Amino acid sequence: MTYRVIQWSTGNVGIHALRLIARHPDLELVGLWVHSPEKVGVDAGTLAGIEPTGVLATNDIDALLALDADCVCYTATADLRPAEALADMTRIAASGKNIVSSSVVPMIWPDHMPAGLRAPLEQACEDAAVSCWTSGIDPGWANDLLPLVLSG
């Protein structure tokens, strides 16, 4: 089975995800969201430094969410904009797409996040019968333990 995937951003994490999605035999890149206007209309492969994919970058959220996709790989920066990132993710879930994310670090352990912040996303996932899975280097090994071990 091939999963149809939209990549959401081309930043520090997103660019690596984009390369891997584009080249994975079980994944089909069907859309790419970009923040920068100068990236709109550019082939995803060109942005990722790989062969062309035929998928053009866009900042048109409605058009992306109208695509037939199984999943969105959401890697937009959320450190300074967690409410906006959660709003994006809620909108994605409400469109019927599963989410895999490295953004909004507290979503790694959602029960430790204020219920008022996570409730809209959880409700959208439940209503659309989709999932949201967040993972990454935070919290734990790379940002918490490794610097402590290396400094000692």
Task: Please place each PLM-identified region on the residue numbering.
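N-terminal glycine-/serine-/threonine-rich beta1-alpha1-beta2 phosphate-ribose binding loop
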Residues: M1-A94
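Gly/Ser/Thr-rich loops at beta-strand to alpha-helix junctions
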Residues: G11-V13, P106-W109, M113-P114, I137-N143
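Generic secondary-structure signature for well-ordered alpha-helical cores
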Residues: A22-D26, E126, V130, S151-G152
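Hydrophobic beta-strand scaffold residues
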Residues: L29, I99-V100, S131-C132
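Short, ordered loop/turn segments at secondary-structure junctions
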Residues: H35-P37, T77, K97, S103-M107, ...
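Short, hinge-like loop/turn segments at secondary-structure boundaries
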Residues: T46-E51, L117-P120, L150-G152
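Rossmann-fold NAD(P)-binding glycine/threonine-rich loop
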Residues: L86-A87, A94-S95, S103-V130
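Conserved anion/nucleotide-ligand pocket segment
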Residues: W133-G152
